[in-house]
Amino acid sequence: MDLRQFLMCLSLCTAFALSKPTEKKDRVHHEPQLSDKVHNDAQSFDYDHDAFLGAEEAKTFDQLTPEESKERLGKIVSKIDGDKDGFVTVDELKDWIKFAQKRWIYEDVERQWKGHDLNEDGLVSWEEYKNATYGYVLDDPDPDDGFNYKQMMVRDERRFKMADKDGDLIATKEEFTAFLHPEEYDYMKDIVVQETMEDIDKNADGFIDLEEYIGDMYSHDGNTDEPEWVKTEREQFVEFRDKNRDGKMDKEETKDWILPSDYDHAEAEARHLVYESDQNKDGKLTKEEIVDKYDLFVGSQATDFGEALVRHDEF
């Protein structure tokens, strides 16, 4: 077994070993918060910095001089302006904020890409992925660790085909990202729902009933009483999850559960940044307008917040 397979098995075994009967498994995919800072521009622009750059990148700007911050911000603006018309719209800014918040996903894809693009042609075929991930264990029809790797491979192949938009079984980096992180792509959400239902639907009737729903979250340990959160989840299932009150969740009800329509924090922040920076009030930003408000977008080591507030109030 190669290192990748060993680590995969180790992580799975560790997860099983460390899990406790009363721990709650959360299958709901929420949009992450843009920042753990309070969004109060009267006190600081830290929330805006985290939202625009991502929390880790925002820290690097705190070490720059104002001149360095402005220069680097100008380069970022050029990337945000997708259609290169010289303006940054709310939609372009929203897309950038979402990218900044999910930079870790792209970093994860980059790491995995190097291990799967075996012929280094800038693409990852299903054969490359299968050989790199399952090549060794498939030779052993009855592995000692008990995992059904063939079943896992069939499931991965189905997801790979869904991510592969042109159906050539060769993934571009964007398609490979959709394969590894399907919850981030609208066209992959059905496969996320399907896989979730397969995991929970123990009697394979195509639905998730109350006991299957609870059983996925909680393993009863002997004669102990159910934790309070389990009772709450039972109520949630009856009152909110099972919308048509037939005692089980179908595909659409499961989708509403695990992929809720959250408040779009990225769009709200994009509109806020445009409102605060749009000097001529034309609904879009020039590079000059953004750089002029660099303290709002990125800050710097030498930003005087009192002076920044004066400029903020002038607009």
Curated annotation (Swiss-Prot):
Domain of life of the organism encoding this protein: Eukaryota
Chain positions found as N6-acetyllysine: K165
Chain sites annotated for binding Ca(2+) 2: D117, N119, D121, E128
Residues binding Ca(2+) 4: D201, N203, D205, E212
Summary of the tissues where the protein is detected: Ubiquitously expressed. Expressed at high levels in heart, placenta and skeletal muscle, at lower levels in lung, kidney and pancreas and at very low levels in brain and liver.
Binding site for Ca(2+) 3: D164, D166, D168, E175
Keywords: Acetylation, Calcium, Endoplasmic reticulum, Glycoprotein, Golgi apparatus, Membrane, Metal-binding, Phosphoprotein, Repeat, Sarcoplasmic reticulum, Secreted, Signal
Entry GO CC: endoplasmic reticulum; endoplasmic reticulum lumen; endoplasmic reticulum membrane; extracellular region; Golgi apparatus; melanosome; membrane; sarcoplasmic reticulum lumen
UniProt xrefs under SMART domains: EFh
Domain EF-hand: 68-103, 104-139, 151-186, 188-223, 229-264, 265-300
Protein name listed in UniProt: Calumenin
Organism in which the protein naturally occurs: Homo sapiens
